């Protein structure tokens, strides 16, 4: 096991516009090839799109973002466990950090899968839908929950 450097929670700087560490981590997840400024531009433009759509409502883009992340977070997932030569899909609780990571991944995956529009528009739309409990990321979460529900019989194998 390596004893190398690991980035800690405290070292993550909040993003410059909204002063939010969760958003900063989301930007890092969106980033490709170390191009952080491009990722920031995409997220901030997506937030501008959201603000345009909200128009008269009292919610802000950052509120929509937080609500979307909260809605997409899974509570349970299935993990493979080998017992006596057979692999079982065992439902398990998801740890808080993994919940957040999965939510980020699913939202970005949903936004990237829809082609034909600029990324900031796709991301803005996906965040809006997720905040209303709709969209592809929510479908992924529901599918994960259904899978866990279907394999409830193997819950006693949890470690």
Place the predicted regions along the sequence by residue.
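Strongly charged
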Residues: 2-33, 37, 45-159
